[in-house]
Amino acid sequence: MNVIIDTHIFLWALAEPLKLSDAKRSALEDLSNRIYVSTVTIAELMIKASVGKLQIDFNPVAKAKESGFALLDFNPEAALLLKEMPFFHKDPFDRMLIAQSIAHNYPIMTEDSKISLYPCRVV
């Protein structure tokens, strides 16, 4: 299964894996799954770090690769979906992850209940 992980799932997987449910940890560890960290997540982390909302002392691209995660670029097809998406969720980064999920037909691993209001699968 191909899965996009939300930003908080990425951070928890790296630093606080016990915050993840057993099912989520199992899915992340299952070698038959391809787990994606979006370039949107990388941008979100860097922007939050630059304005002092988050302290990051690691390179998230390198850490994603070291952890066995693949990177998923935000593409034009996903960007075009943003125009028609309802504003159930106001966070622009989450909206872009939702658009990627819809464009690629990959589920999103998240604890954010607002994401389930969109026509994407949530795990």
For each feature predicted by the language model, list its residue ranges.
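Short glycine/serine/threonine-enriched helix-capping/active-site loop
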Residues: 37-38, 74
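Short, well-structured N-terminal submotif of metal-dependent ribonuclease cores
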Residues: 1-37, 51-62, 104, 113
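Residue-level signal for well-ordered alpha-helical positions
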Residues: 16-17, 48, 85, 121
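A generic structural signal for short hydrophobic patches within well-formed alpha-helices
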Residues: 10, 42, 79, 115-116
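Active-site neighborhoods of divalent-metal-dependent phosphate/nucleic-acid chemistry enzymes
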Residues: 57, 69-111, 120-123
